[in-house]
Amino acid sequence: YKFYNNPNALGLGMVSSPSIEDVTLSEDNPFENQNMVFNALAGTTKEYFTKIPVINSEMENVSTSQLTDGHTKYFPTDTSIAECHIDYVVKMDKDSYLYMYLPTKYERSCNVWIQDEDDYIDGSEPMEYAGQFFVGDNYSIMNLGKFYEGQELRIRITVANDDNEAYWKDQLFYTFDYDSFAQTCADMQKNVLEVTSFEDTYLEGTVNSENDGSVLFTTIPYENGWTITVNGKKVTAEKSLDSLITIPLEQGENKITMKFSPDYWKVSLIITGFGVALLVLIFLFEYKRGKVMKKVLAKANFTAESSEKATTPVINDTNDT
């Protein structure tokens, strides 16, 4: 096994401006989602991910049609020809990794290829296979490699599935400003939650807030059943990004306690208690009924024996003289 230290890790919780509670995520652009989230957390207005435009596009044996929901359908013009691809040419704005994402609701497998534009024009080398896109685990942001500022790259997407079709709303290519991201992480690491106690359903820690009105943004999923206190006072957690717990803070040092008891746990205790009480009542009822039955049976036996004695004839044994 190999273990790697992440120098940019922010831990279980970090101090944030309350604007994180107002962030609404887009369904179609994960790059801008990350920009919005990180800027809200850090109180910055930076472009950590920067979109680079497509400066040229070409298609071979491809026809298109527009769907009413904003998707474009790509399919072979002539199905007897095996090749069917779309090329996008982009120019790097900085030394960076290049990332690609094609938003869609209709996943159809495609193959992705990449090549330096000068090499493509020269024709001396074949395109490099970058991987498969869409379908299952392959439908995510794709890292196409690390390139340098000013470099032009050709990205080819080939329709490669039995349906002979592909759909996407847009073609997104982004670079990443790692240095700016790392510096922001270093600043945020100064005000993260220091966990002092941790159990399956309990967490305790401290965090310092420089400003009044700040919140603690956590990576803990929001769910009913949490009891949270800040400096001994019970508080109500908010939900951020439609999924994660956010806790209001006071200016200065904050001692946080979080205890989880799911709603069904209380219900199950009530049901269990009712069941136990019912069993006790049944036992007592059966116990008392058993004593009564013994008396009834004893009386019945006594009556039967008395009746038997009363009806049995008495034979007198006399001798004739």
Question: Where on the chain are the PLM-derived regions?
Answer:
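Aromatic/acidic, Gly/Pro-rich catalytic loop(s) in extracytoplasmic/lumenal soluble domains
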Residues: 1-31, 115-117
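Short, flexible coil/turn micro-motifs enriched in small/turn-prone residues
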Residues: 6-8, 38, 227
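Intrinsic disorder/low-complexity detector
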Residues: 8, 41, 172, 256, ...
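Extracellular carbohydrate-recognition regions
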Residues: 16-67
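Intrinsically disordered, low-complexity peptide-like regions
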Residues: 31-33, 54, 252, 299, ...
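Active-site-proximal, structured, solvent-exposed surfaces of multi-pass membrane proteins
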Residues: 45-305
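Solvent-exposed, low-complexity, intrinsically disordered
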Residues: 297-321
